Design a protein with these regions (language model features):
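Short alpha-helical Gxxx[C/S/T] motif in the catalytic ATP-binding
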Residues: 120, 124
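A conserved beta-strand-to-alpha-helix junction within the catalytic ATP-binding
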Residues: 3-19
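Short conserved segment of the HATPase_c
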Residues: 93-105
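Short helix-loop "hinge" at the ATP-lid/N-box region of the Bergerat-fold HATPase_c
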Residues: 60-61
Length: 155
C-alpha cells in the first residue's frame, strides 16, 4: 500500500548493503550523495523502492570494472521533483534510443554475462511508473558509463 515515505534512509540502506558486499568482491565503491536535505518524501512503497535501487545497482555493478566507482545521488529539483541518479563507469549504452532498454525481454548484454531474463529494467520501469515517476537512461558525456535517472513527484 502506498504511503508517505522518506526515501533517503531506504536508498542509503541499500547502498550500505551493496557496499559491504561489492567492496570486497569487486573492489567497487558506491558513493552516496545528496543535496544536503535529510528528507525526500514521496508517495510510495518502501520495499519497491529498495527493489528498484537494488536492480539498478546490480546492472551498474555488472558493467563496472574491478576498482570502479558508482555514484547514487538524490536531490530535489526546482520544480519539486525528487531525482535519484545512478551513475556508473561501465561501458554506457550502445543504443541511440535508450528507451528500448526498458522493453520486456530486451537484452544488450555480452554473452560473458551469462543468462538473464531481460526483465530487470522493465520491472524497474513499471515500479517507477507505479510511483508516478519517470526513468530515463543516458550515457555520461565522456562516454565513460551510464546514467539512470528516476524522478518522483515529492510530497
Amino acid at each position: 500500500k502506498m504511503k508517505k515515505i522518506n526515501i533517503e534512509p531506504i536508498i542509503q540502506s541499500v547502498v550500505d548493503d551493496y557496499n559491504s558486499i561489492y567492496k570486497v568482491k569487486k573492489y567497487i565503491k558506491i558513493n552516496y550523495e545528496n543535496d544536503g536535505k535529510k528528507e525526500y518524501f514521496i508517495n510510495g512503497i518502501e520495499n519497491r523502492i529498495e527493489q528498484m535501487i537494488a536492480n539498478l545497482l546490480d546492472n551498474s555493478i555488472s558493467f563496472t570494472e574491478k576498482g570502479g566507482k558508482i555514484i547514487v545521488n538524490i536531490s530535489i529539483t526546482s520544480n519539486r521533483k525528487i531525482t535519484v541518479k545512478i551513475i556508473d563507469e561501465g561501458q554506457g549504452f550502445k543504443e541511440k534510443d535508450t528507451s528500448k532498454i526498458f522493453r520486456r525481454f530486451y537484452s544488450n548484454r555480452p554473452d560473458k554475462f551469462g543468462e538473464h531474463s531481460g526483465l530487470g529494467l522493465n520491472i524497474v520501469k513499471n515500479l517507477v511508473e507505479l510511483h508516478d515517476g519517470k526513468i530515463v537512461a543516458s550515457n555520461r558525456p565522456n562516454n565513460k558509463g551510464a546514467i539512470m535517472e528516476i524522478s518522483f513527484p515529492s510530497m
